[in-house]
């Protein structure tokens, strides 16, 4: 735009997107890259309870690493206490409200048409220092989409909460 060029007007735009993180084929368990991938995806799922537009919604991994990534993410997420952030040790708080909880459940149901839940995704989970039924809590949830190239829903539906879908790729 001419005004931006002429007057150097600051401009910041956020475009709606389903962000992803892609694990390289040589990043296998025991490598720093694999560990970094697991740490970052786990962090992105749980920071702000996944309520940020830049959160990783799709974890794209080599087919040969799907099981290792899934197990490592599940192990990491099991160590994330959900509840009142004022309580020592709690790592993930609530969603913004009950309407948001229902929106995330709805998105998970839609994603379930092409994915399976491999962690979380159930209303039966522990909440520390708060009442799960009175609050707006949602469990860290992992899905697995076996055929992402044939699953338009996995690339168009965003669960705006602590939800990520693992997707394999087959060639490098």
Language-model features, listed with the residues they occupy:
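C-terminal lobe/hinge of AMP-binding adenylation domains
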Residues: 155-158
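Active-site donor-binding acidic/aromatic loop of nucleotide-activated sugar
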Residues: 165-167
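ALDH superfamily catalytic-core signature
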Residues: 1-150, 169-172
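Glycine-rich nucleotide-phosphate-binding loops and adjacent flexible coil segments
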Residues: 162
